[in-house]
Amino acid sequence: DAEEIVAGKKTLLQISSENKLKLAAEFFYDEKIIRQFGTVSFLVSDLPLQDEEMLNKVLNIPELFYTVLTPKDESKKRLSQLSKAGKRYALLLDDNITELNFKLSSRYSDDKIKKSIKEIVGTFYNAVFFIIDDRSDLFESEKFPLIQSELLKRGIKLTLSSKLETLTSSKVNAEDKFQDFMLTVKKNDEKVLVVSANDYLTISELIPSYRKIGYKFIYPGDIIIKR
């Protein structure tokens, strides 16, 4: 049996066997020791919006994260649920927006673009920041400067998807991929990791272990907003 007693800057470790004390050691906290691990935050994508049970499992994970939504009615219907669960979100703009009231297209007139932006911002006004897929046709189009201008004048923070880390894995190796990622996080790093809801359910169980050894986990907004 092992017993750890913490008192101020001193820790007493006692190891016993068969009710006999085998080892007793004192450890003292050294204020000169500096944290050697970096900071990580999570953006959880691919929410199971049509699966109530799975969605609740994700929202009930007791860790710090934002969800990632795309402009569509299914996302709109879940906004109050996210709010009640105390979860905030970022909004992704890419080529996959299909619903006409939210759609952004290089073929649209400036007025139609402005109307769509107004609808998006009016519906998802609680988004902490917007993400633009900078590998999308939308980003490369001649309409993007207008989209960017309309967002910035509303005080919306816009970040590029390429500035974010992405955990690409299968269900089998999510833990291994996450552990590989954590090895890349150095002491001065502040990384935002995009991870699918399914994978986050798996890797969230590993987070407390990393926190114990010195890694810091915070909300993505604390990194993105100050950039």
Residue ranges and their predicted role:
Residues 199-227:
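C-terminal domain-boundary segment and adjacent tail
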Residues 70, 92-118, 134-138, 145, ...:
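Long, folded non-catalytic interaction modules
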Residues 150-176, 217-227:
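His/Asp/Glu-enriched short active-site or ligand-binding loop at hydrolase and phosphoryl-transfer sites
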Residues 27-102:
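Active-site beta->alpha N-cap acidic-glycine motif
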Residues 39-41, 64-68, 86-90, 126-131, ...:
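Structural preference for beta-strand elements that scaffold enzyme active sites
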Residues 1-41:
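Non-catalytic propeptide/linker segments at domain boundaries
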Residues 110-134, 180-194:
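CE4/NodB-like, metal-dependent polysaccharide N-deacetylase domain
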Residues 43, 47, 100-109, 129-142, ...:
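Second-shell loop/turn segments in exported
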